[in-house]
């Protein structure tokens, strides 16, 4: 298997420390709000990696943390008039429900930051003792100049980072790029109970040391793969490497750094509450977008490339899934799930996934299988190929309820609200002169078993095909 390693800026053959036990750490959610599709893309990407590694190695330890204390959580707790425990428990529950709808496996361990304070204090103490951290007025800072490789992951020079917008300039720092490991408790922290005793005074941890502590607690000072979104590369992951390697001399921390690309909406817009364009997983599910459709959209683009979310991407995913479901509509779910041990994952699917998780190529291979299924008239061969299709798709976390429920959903039991929404979208596209999109929507509706006719007065009528 090959993975693109950000630290080396190249694809590398994956060679774990221990071929019997692979260790993976991925930065998880900060639980103060609903998960949006950018969060969800990252979860799905590393779910595929987890599934692939489980297919290739005897044991995989997958750790994905929960950040349950930070400034955003404290501010949300104050504004919603809840305790931190109530707020974080609520949004953790909703996060789990959302990613369950996307058919994501549970990680091996899911530590919460507040449960690992002692480990954080241990790491901070080691850094101070080794001269990599210092105390100023109850705040503990990491000295970036003490680590000669600082900036290697993000490809930045220390001098260039000083002028960056994410570097906080504070007079008491030895260097403007130094970052917080421990901060004194504010009155609000004390009021909400978001603070703990330490040798440097009552306070709470900085964000970066949380992940170093949780990865160390469950995977040791060095492990195989660290994953996360590209937006976390700097400063979060850069700081993680620095403090972990300095706290444990001789450790390489993570052997491979994997980052998934950015997600935008509506033709390249960055999601923002101020723009009102944040799309949550829960919102999509509530509007009738199936979790499998969401997952398919994510996997249709290579994980390292930018992904733009829009109606067309959803329509394309529905059409593609519909073609796959129809190829197996003569078989029950029980029949397709029986005898899977006698068939293997399609060679082209496995080869694509082993090549830096190339899910678009793997999906293309699934559609080639669909063509073979549709072409053969031999019932036994059709069933064998359908089982290969099912097993191959399962490796990517697809086809959880394959095929019966999905076929019904896609073959005519389409919600009227969804039909009307698509028709309104088509009318709007025609008004704007986007006839290509209008034609694509017509074709999508047709594939769902819906015919439409345009009246001379500009109205559009629809009917279910027989």
UniProtKB/Swiss-Prot annotation:
Pfam families listed in its UniProt record: DALR_2, tRNA-synt_1e
Cofactor note: Binds 1 zinc ion per subunit.
Name of this chain's protein: Cysteine--tRNA ligase
UniProt keyword Chaperone present: no
Annotated motif 'HIGH' region, positions: 29-39
The organism of origin for this protein: Anaplasma marginale (strain St. Maries)
Family: Belongs to the class-I aminoacyl-tRNA synthetase family.
Binding site for ATP: 273
Record-level GO cellular component terms: cytosol
Main location: cytoplasm
GO molecular function, one term: ATP binding
Domain of life: Bacteria
């Amino acid at each position: 298997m090959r993975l693109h390693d950000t630290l080396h800026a190249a694809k590398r053959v994956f060679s774990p420390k221990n071929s019997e036990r692979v260790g993976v750490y991925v930065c998880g959610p900060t639980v103060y709000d609903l998960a949006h599709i950018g969060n969800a893309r990252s979860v799905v990407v590393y779910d595929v990696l987890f599934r692939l590694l489980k297919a290739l190695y005897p044991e995989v330890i997958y750790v994905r943390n929960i950040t349950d204390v930070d400034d955003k959580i404290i501010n949300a707790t104050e504004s919603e008039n809840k305790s931190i425990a109530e707020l974080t428990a609520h949004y953790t529950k909703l996060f789990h429900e959302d990613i369950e709808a996307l058919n994501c496996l549970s990680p091996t361990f899911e530590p919460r930051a507040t449960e690992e304070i002692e480990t954080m204090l241990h790491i901070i103490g080691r850094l101070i003792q080794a001269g990599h951290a210092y105390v100023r007025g109850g705040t503990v800072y990491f000295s970036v100049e003490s680590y000669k490789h600082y900036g290697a992951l993000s490809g930045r020079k220390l001098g260039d980072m000083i002028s960056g917008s994410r570097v906080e300039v504070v007079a008491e720092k030895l260097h403007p790029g130094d970052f917080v490991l421990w901060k004194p408790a504010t009155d609000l922290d004390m009021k909400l109970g978001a603070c703990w005793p330490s040798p440097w005074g009552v306070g709470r941890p900085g964000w970066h040391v949380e992940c170093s502590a949780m990865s160390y607690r469950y995977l040791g000072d060095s492990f195989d793969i660290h994953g996360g979104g590209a937006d976390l590369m700097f400063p979060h992951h850069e700081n993680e490497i620095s403090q972990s390697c300095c706290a444990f001399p001789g450790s390489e921390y993570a052997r491979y750094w994997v980052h998934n690309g950015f997600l935008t909406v509506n033709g390249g817009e960055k999601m923002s509450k101020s723009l009102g364009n944040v799309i949550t997983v829960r919102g999509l599910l509530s509007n009738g977008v199936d979790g499998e459709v969401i997952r398919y959209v994510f996997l249709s683009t290579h994980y390292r490339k930018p992904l733009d979310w829009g109606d067309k991407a959803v329509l394309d995913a529905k059409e593609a899934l519909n073609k796959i479901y129809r190829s197996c509509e003569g078989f029950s779910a029980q029949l397709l799930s029986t005898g899977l041990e006698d068939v293997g994952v399609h060679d082209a699917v496995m080869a694509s996934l082993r090549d830096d998780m190339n899910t678009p190529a793997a999906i293309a291979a699934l559609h080639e299988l669909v063509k073979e299924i549709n072409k053969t008239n031999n019932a036994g061969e059709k069933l064998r190929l359908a089982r290969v299709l099912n097993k191959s798709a399962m490796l990517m976390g697809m086809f959880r309820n394959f095929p019966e429920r999905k076929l019904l959903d896609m073959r005519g039991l389409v919600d009227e609200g969804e039909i009307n929404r698509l028709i309104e979208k088509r009318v709007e596209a025609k008004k704007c002169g986007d006839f290509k999109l209008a034609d694509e929507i017509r074709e999508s509706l047709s594939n769902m078993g819906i015919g439409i006719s345009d009246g001379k007065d500009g109205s559009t009528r629809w009917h279910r095909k027989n």
